[in-house]
Amino acid sequence: MKAFILSLLIIPTLLFANPKPKTKTINWISFEKAIELNKTNPKPILIDVYTDWCTWCHKMDASTYKEEVIVDYINSNFYAVKLNAEQKEDINFNNHTFKYVGNERRGTHELASSLLNGKMSYPSTVFLNKDLELVQAIPGYLQAPIMEKLINYMGEEIYLDKEWDTFDKEFKSKI
């Protein structure tokens, strides 16, 4: 009987004591750091344009950007940047200083506005090629299966040779 009671006490302790496996995360860096790294090791840049108040941005962080296939591919093939569309700090890029425009309560960052062609939508995913040229800005929440297709299409520069519709039909998901 003592052994039974002891096992009832020990087993739950052991179950809850097991550390959870470490979750992989995307190596988010600043825009400036991505530009700097690109000089010595050119890679495309994925930019997640978000705001602090955006519910769908938080949902995308908690789901799409936690999917292991997505995390691994982005970390291997892109410089990943989180760009707060309402940040107040200046960003220097291509001999231009991008600033926050607006007042304390409402405004946007010029870089976010430039990348999104003035069509402010959050979240938005922006792809720059290795030469730091805008390839595509995609507005809205992206579920993991769609993101997986997009990062492969952009990361491997398939867009240079193949239409999206053809690629979309041929793509084999790992999710």
Please place each PLM-identified region on the residue numbering:
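Positively charged n-region of N-terminal signal peptides that target proteins for export
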Residues: 1-5
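Hydrophobic h-region of N-terminal signal peptides that target proteins for export
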Residues: 8-17
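Short active-site neighborhood of thiol/selenol oxidoreductases, capturing the structured segment around
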Residues: 41-55, 80
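A short beta-strand-turn-helix
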Residues: 27-45, 74
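Thiol-/selenol-based redox modules, centered on thioredoxin-like
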Residues: 134-175
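A short, hydrophobic beta-strand/beta-hairpin element that forms part of a small beta-sheet core
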Residues: 80, 111-114, 120-138
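Short, internal strand/loop/helix patches
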Residues: 97-119
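Typically the conserved alpha-helix immediately C-terminal to a functionally engaged Cys/Sec
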Residues: 58-75
